[in-house]
């Protein structure tokens, strides 16, 4: 039981580190648009049917929102991004 718990915890920690690393990379590239880029990648994964990728990039977007004081986060822009990606996937 303890071994399974330890394995789960290590996997969870590795995933959180990957999310933090990807968020940091997006912020370093362009802090203002990092949230939108992560949302676009989440939308692409969603419309490809990649649930794991969607969850990852949605988590990255949340991490960008958490750590960046200047990242833009307009919901109308996010909706436009989702609509664009939806149209591309058809």
Could you say what each language-model-derived stretch is?
Residues 46-49:
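Hydrophobic/aromatic side-chain positions at a characteristic register within alpha-helices
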């Amino acid at each position: 039981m303890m071994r399974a718990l330890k394995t789960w915890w290590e996997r969870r920690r590795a995933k959180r580190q990957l999310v933090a690393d990807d968020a940091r990379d997006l912020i370093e590239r362009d802090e203002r648009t990092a949230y939108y880029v992560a949302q676009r990648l989440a939308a692409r994964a969603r419309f490809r049917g990649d649930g794991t990728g969607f969850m990852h990039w949605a988590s990255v977007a949340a991490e960008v929102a958490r750590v960046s004081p200047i990242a833009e986060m307009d919901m109308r822009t996010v909706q436009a991004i989702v609509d664009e990606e939806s149209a591309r996937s058809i």
